[in-house]
Amino acid sequence: MKEVSEKITERIRKLIRLKESATQIGSEGEAHAAAAAGHRLLMEYNLSLLDLAGENPQNRLTACESDRISYKDAAGNIWKRDLMRVLCEYNYCKMLLYAGTTHMVVIGTEENAATVIALFDYLRKTFRRLSEEKYSGYAQGRRGYWRTAKGKKDYIRSYLEGCIPGLRMQLEN
């Protein structure tokens, strides 16, 4: 990890304060620009908000654990687990799996964990809906295997598993 100077951490703190004050006065553009600049520096130096809290215990952010979330799915379990892993990676959280089950939990600050869970629910539903829509269009021009229940399941599983690398590429940019 890069050695981060106090100058960089202080700059990020100033950007966070600027974002908060701009939000309070209703300047959405300025708040968004400050948040984007702060996020860019956090990503560049591989930092999280916990790294900026310093030694003062009252400034420390507390970690929390989400409720158990099932990643069991008729189209295969891998895509949901990978979706959660990507969302946690880009939202400063960790995902833990319960051994011998199809359950996982999110560990992170309350705000970050809530963001990950909300994104997971939204993207899970959206990817499922899109997979059905794409299959309908794909199956119209096909015969045989791709019109069977197994062909549909294979298509949807492949589509869902392919969504995750695409999401990762979008989050990297």
Describe every region a protein language model picked out.
Residues 8-22, 41:
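Non-transmembrane amphipathic alpha-helical segments
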Residues 28-37:
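Short, charged, amphipathic alpha-helical segments
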